[in-house]
Amino acid sequence: MAPKKKKKVTGLIKLQIQAGQANPAPPVGPALGAHGVNIMEFCKAYNAATENQRGNVVPVEITVYEDRSFDFKLKTPPAAKLLLKAAGLQKGSGVPHTQKVGKVSMAQVREIAETKKEDLNARDIDAAAKIIAGTARSMGITVEG
């Protein structure tokens, strides 16, 4: 049997799409169409993979190969979105260092850090929590504890 040839990568697409709600309309359609990917095939696969995370924005990294096939890797939801959900807010502060818009506890920050640990370049949970706390501060959310 001949050894498997590694497929040649022709593109890498990064998108942030609502979980379970990918459709061929912009921004998904044009981004994938430019690389010749079967858009409906991706939408069905993405929606099936993110069905249990509805309500979150789930970033996805799509690797497109020479033969127009693709693989995709799901990431964890953005820290900013998780912080807004934890604080019960719609959006962060326009002037974060002077106007605070919400509060989260250190326990909530650690919980978000646990969720995001695989995507953060932190060695332990304390370092990951510091990264998340910094994101919260830059959004005008106070971290208590």
From Swiss-Prot:
One or more lysine residues are methylated. GO terms for molecular function: large ribosomal subunit rRNA binding; structural constituent of ribosome. Belongs to the universal ribosomal protein uL11 family. Forms part of the ribosomal stalk which helps the ribosome interact with GTP-bound translation factors. Keywords: Methylation, Ribonucleoprotein, Ribosomal protein, RNA-binding, rRNA-binding. The keyword Cytoplasm does not apply. InterPro entries: Ribosomal_uL11 (IPR000911), Ribosomal_uL11_bac-typ (IPR006519), Ribosomal_uL11_C (IPR020783), Ribosomal_uL11_C_sf (IPR036769), Ribosomal_uL11_CS (IPR020785), Ribosomal_uL11_N (IPR020784), Ribosomal_uL11_N_sf (IPR036796). It comes from Corynebacterium glutamicum (strain ATCC 13032 / DSM 20300 / JCM 1318 / BCRC 11384 / CCUG 27702 / LMG 3730 / NBRC 12168 / NCIMB 10025 / NRRL B-2784 / 534). This is Large ribosomal subunit protein uL11. GO terms for biological process: translation. It holds the Pfam family Ribosomal_L11. One of its GO terms (cellular component) is cytosolic large ribosomal subunit. The keyword Glycosyltransferase does not apply. Part of the ribosomal stalk of the 50S ribosomal subunit. Interacts with L10 and the large rRNA to form the base of the stalk. L10 forms an elongated spine to which L12 dimers bind in a sequential fashion forming a multimeric L10(L12)X complex. Disulfide bonds: none annotated.
